[in-house]
Amino acid sequence: MAAELAMGAELPSSPLAIEYVNDFDLMKFEVKKEPPEAERFCHRLPPGSLSSTPLSTPCSSVPSSPSFCAPSPGTGSSAGGGGSAAQAGGAPGPPSGGPGTVGGASGKAVLEDLYWMSGYQHHLNPEALNLTPEDAVEALIGSGHHSAHHGAHHPAAAAAYEAFRGQSFAGGGGGGADDMGAGHHHGAHHTAHHHHSAHHHHHHHHHHGGSGHHGGGAGHGGGGAGHHVRLEERFSDDQLVSMSVRELNRQLRGFSKEEVIRLKQKRRTLKNRGYAQSCRFKRVQQRHILESEKCQLQSQVEQLKLEVGRLAKERDLYKEKYEKLAGRGGPGGAGGAGFPREPSPAQAGPGAAKGAPDFFL
């Protein structure tokens, strides 16, 4: 009784809070009838669960509120309220006979934190958050890592927590508390083992659920610059230019919008630069072709000019020969050939008169 009074002195003194905690009973609410598949999904225990009842599912999304006092008859069947109170080291129930208290005012805050943490620890269901078993393992790893950091920063709180755990496990009433304690010890060792073995395999992924958000946020913030560097160095200029838009969009899935826009602007710049270079190269090539054709045509024109000059000289030579031949066949040459011409009447009269006596002489 002295232990119970000492514990009662450290409990919250607000009557409204105590009345709310004691009167909060989920069994008085009507249960919505679900199809057989949903009911089978709700009553299926996830692998590695520490509780003997189904965890937080769409059918029971509201966690049962833990109670500092003895559990009500309605909530006694569920492991959410009674089991958590026994585990957290609250006021021992009637079956318990050992001391389950924590002395001193320094353990009050730690007791309340552990009380609510243990109450909500049973309602972390990966299936309710649409998570895979790998995400659940990552959440456990992040939770263990986070609690280890808190223990390193607050050694006094860690020592009080260990003392509180030892006393609560020693003074817990019934086999249920012992089973829960053993289960939690096994879960702690399992979490530590996974933290050491799977840390190198999952350090690139984000943690979901519970305190894993801290690790996930830090990893995401630290990897932003790495993503930017990897995205810039992932594709070369030739790959960006030659890759199709569909293939590029498929490769850019999972990156931030700013990085994708920056990479696409770089690709557009490279394509415009390549198009300008190709146009310039084509213009230079066409100019070279035209210049070569011009040189060929000019050489042909020179050859034709030389041919025209040669033909002109040959023409002049033939013309001169023709004129010479035509001059030899003139009037004097033709008369000696034996074709006499009749003299004109002016020349024929005296010649005939003079030639007649010569002819007769």
Swiss-Prot record:
Its main location: nucleus. The gene is Mafa. The modification Phosphoserine is found at S14, S49, S61, S65. Residues 183-211 have a biased composition (Basic residues). CDD domains: bZIP_Maf_large (cd14718). Residues 212-226, 327-338 have a biased composition (Gly residues). Residues 290-311 are annotated as: Leucine-zipper. Belongs to the bZIP family. The lineage of its organism: Eukaryota, Metazoa, Chordata, Craniata, Vertebrata. It comes from Rattus norvegicus (Rat). This is Transcription factor MafA. PROSITE patterns: BZIP. The modification Phosphothreonine is found at T53, T57.
